Regions:
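Short, small-residue-biased leader/transition segments that mark boundaries at the very start
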Residues: 3-5
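Long, charged amphipathic helices and adjacent flexible linkers at domain junctions
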Residues: 23-72, 187-199
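C-terminal edge-of-domain segments
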Residues: 26-29, 270-286
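Conserved structured catalytic cores and adjacent interaction surfaces
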Residues: 32, 76-176, 278
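Gly-rich Lys/Arg/Thr-decorated short loops/hinges at beta-loop-alpha junctions or inter-strand turns
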Residues: 34-37, 60-69, 77-94, 202-214
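Internal, active-site/partner-interface "lid" segment
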Residues: 150-228
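C-terminal tails and terminal domains of large nucleic-acid-associated
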Residues: 238-244
Length: 286
């Protein structure tokens, strides 16, 4: 997974609501993806290989805490990392694809964040503990863990940040923003199992709503459509559909079309090429 650090250089004000801000960011990303696609594929592969080996050699240098507030955020996948960067990430630390960052990784990232108070957004329930264990290990700045359990929660928390509010006010605003998001995921079974009343075969597609298994055995596109349908209600105004490394652009657009037809015109839907491992789709519904 990758960790991204956001300093306060890009203050997000309350006036920018999740929907409109994310729309702008996603338009920028689409533009970037278009430019990247225009590069010759061979060039791009060579460039990425060089970048990857460069990243492995770099270690984070500690910096003195001069800003008031900063962020460390955890995410996996180039597109998701780009999205967190677009939201103001100054630096990105890479771990392995399915490897959760250690407490040590988080401490290193915190020390490389030039802020007196550093918010940590784990964005995964399995990383919350590692983040909390980092708190007593850093003495020259304060760490506040906002226990985000999913990528959509992390994005929403980040977007509710108010540079004029105190650290404690922000911590509670960010947590409540995170809790107002529904998260859907579509993944695949790593092995045969029985779970939540389902008999699951290795490789089966699994659709989950807020962590609860709901659908087994559809195609990823069909599954994410069912998940979206289950999470939408009459108050839904914004949906972000983030597709992973196993999904083609055609499949992503087909999923978008199905969800758009179901949601109708009143719902703002955005598609993001997240490139994340493990999850075919991550869905944010607000």
């Amino acid at each position: 997974s990758e960790m991204c650090i956001r300093d306060r250089g890009v203050a997000l004000t309350k006036a920018l609501e999740f929907g409109s801000l994310l729309t702008v960011k996603i338009e920028n990303m689409k533009e970037q993806h278009k430019k990247a696609a225009e590069l010759n594929n061979a060039n791009r592969a060579a460039y990425e290989a060089a970048q990857a080996s460069k990243e492995e050699k770099e270690t984070l240098k500690p910096v003195s805490p001069e800003e008031e507030l900063g962020f460390v955020s955890v995410a996996a996948g180039d597109g998701l990392r780009a999205l967190f960067e677009e939201l103001g990430c100054a630096q990105v630390v890479s771990g392995g694809q399915t490897m959760n960052p250690s407490t040590e990784d988080i401490v290193e990232a915190v020390l490389a964040t030039p802020a007196k108070t550093v918010f940590v957004l784990p964005n995964n329930k399995n990383i919350i503990l590692a983040a909390e264990q980092a708190v007593p290990l850093v003495t020259d700045r304060k760490i506040i863990v906002v226990p985000t359990r999913t990528i959509p929660q992390g994005l929403s928390a980040l977007l509710s940040f108010d540079p004029d509010a105190s650290a404690d006010e922000n911590a509670s605003a960010m947590l409540s923003a995170a809790e107002n998001v529904s998260t859907g995921t579509v993944t695949f079974a790593a092995r045969d199992s029985e779970f939540g009343g389902f008999k699951i075969k290795e490789g089966d597609t699994m659709g989950m709503t807020n962590g609860k298994l709901e659908f087994v055995g559809d195609t990823p596109v069909r599954s994410v459509y069912k998940v979206a349908k289950a999470l939408m209600n009459k108050h839904t105004s914004f949906i972000t559909l983030i597709y992973g490394e196993g999904i083609t652009e055609e499949e992503a657009n087909e999923a978008l079309r199905l969800i758009k037809n179901k949601a109708g015109d009143g719902v703002d839907i955005n598609l993001v090429n997240g490139g994340q491992p493990v999850y075919y789709f991550i869905l944010s519904v607000e």
